[in-house]
């Protein structure tokens, strides 16, 4: 804190934080159970997968508060900001047994970030008759998932086929999802209080105030599938490495490998509210 030339006091409080961490989760079981097998006394699975997950997490935060005190008047300026970012890679292997047994491999890569900010200006004034306080604030929050990528592959179980036992992709099994959420909140309030008949045995307190708030939110999603026409691609196209063989410039075309927009506007919305 500081004492200013006019006799007022100024106080400052600030902080910064940063963290970086990597995490690995190995051999996690991801299963769904059906009806328990009482005859063999063991669980029955609808699917049973083993996941390996690799995460990188980054967190950043900042805090800055100011206070100005001058006699019977006090003013405050408050700010806080936080952001979290996460890179995540999940590798999944296992099987699904709904109508038949399917050996599967699944890969997911996504980056997700979340940010929040809150700021406020406030004042407190001691009057001859009572106390007056007011504040005005703004808050912001967002969540961003700019490119979630999912690849699903399944083992060819057709006995006698040239690619029997190999992992392959099918239509719609390479997908990309995009999501963004933003929210803004602005608010203001004022309050007045005073004690009536101060000093007497019966001294009621009068309080009045006003408050207003405006909130707006915008949520947007997009979804894409990769589809392909096997008649215009190599016979072993679906069995290649997804990055090195399939998603190559030479494979793209309206009658070859193309991107299908599967976005549904019902999954997106925009709204506001006044209080």
What are these regions (language model features)?
Residues 1-90, 114-119:
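Transmembrane beta-barrel wall of Gram-negative outer-membrane proteins
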Residues 58-64, 115-121, 136, 184-190, ...:
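Hydrophobic, lipid-facing positions within transmembrane beta-strands of outer-membrane proteins
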Residues 36-48, 94-105, 162-174, 252-263:
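Flexible, solvent-exposed coil segments and beta strand-coil junctions
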Residues 1, 159-173, 220-269:
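Flexible glycine-rich, low-complexity coil/linker segments exposed to the extracellular/periplasmic environment
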Residues 2-10, 72, 128-131, 145, ...:
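Short loop/turn motifs that connect adjacent beta-strands in outer-membrane beta-barrel proteins
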Residues 12-16, 77-79, 132-136, 206-210:
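Membrane-embedded beta-strand positions of outer-membrane beta-barrel proteins
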Residues 18-22, 70, 81-85, 127, ...:
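Transmembrane beta-strands of outer-membrane beta-barrel pores
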Residues 21-30, 76-97, 102, 141-154, ...:
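Outer-membrane beta-barrel and related beta-rich outer-membrane complex signature
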């Amino acid at each position: 804190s500081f004492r200013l030339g006019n006799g007022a006091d100024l106080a400052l409080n600030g902080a910064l934080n940063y963290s970086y961490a990597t995490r690995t989760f190995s051999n996690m079981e991801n299963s769904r159970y059906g009806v328990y097998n009482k005859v063999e006394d063991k669980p029955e699975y609808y699917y049973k997968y083993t996941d390996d997950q690799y995460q990188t997490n980054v967190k950043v935060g900042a805090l800055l508060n100011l206070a100005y005190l001058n006699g019977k008047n006090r003013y405050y300026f408050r700010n806080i900001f936080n952001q979290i970012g996460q890179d995540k890679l999940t590798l999944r292997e296992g099987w699904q047994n709904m109508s038949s047994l399917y050996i599967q491999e699944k890969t997911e890569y996504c980056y997700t970030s979340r940010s929040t900010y809150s700021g406020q200006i406030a004042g407190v004034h001691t009057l001859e008759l009572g106390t007056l306080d007011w504040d005005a604030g703004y808050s912001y929050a967002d969540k961003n998932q700019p490119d979630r990528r999912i690849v699903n592959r399944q083992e060819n179980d057709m006995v006698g086929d040239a690619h029997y036992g190999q992992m392959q992709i099918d239509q719609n099994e390479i997908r990309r999802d995009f999501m963004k959420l933003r929210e803004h909140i602005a608010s203001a309030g004022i309050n007045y209080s005073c004690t009536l008949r101060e000093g007497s045995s019966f001294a009621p307190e009068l309080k009045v105030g006003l408050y207003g708030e405006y909130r707006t939110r915008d949520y947007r999603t997009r979804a894409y599938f990769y589809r392909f026409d096997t008649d215009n691609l190599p016979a072993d196209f679906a069995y290649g490495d997804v990055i090195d063989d399939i998603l190559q410039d030479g494979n793209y075309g309206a009658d070859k490998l193309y991107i299908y927009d599967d976005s549904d506007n019902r999954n997106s919305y925009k709204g506001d509210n006044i209080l």
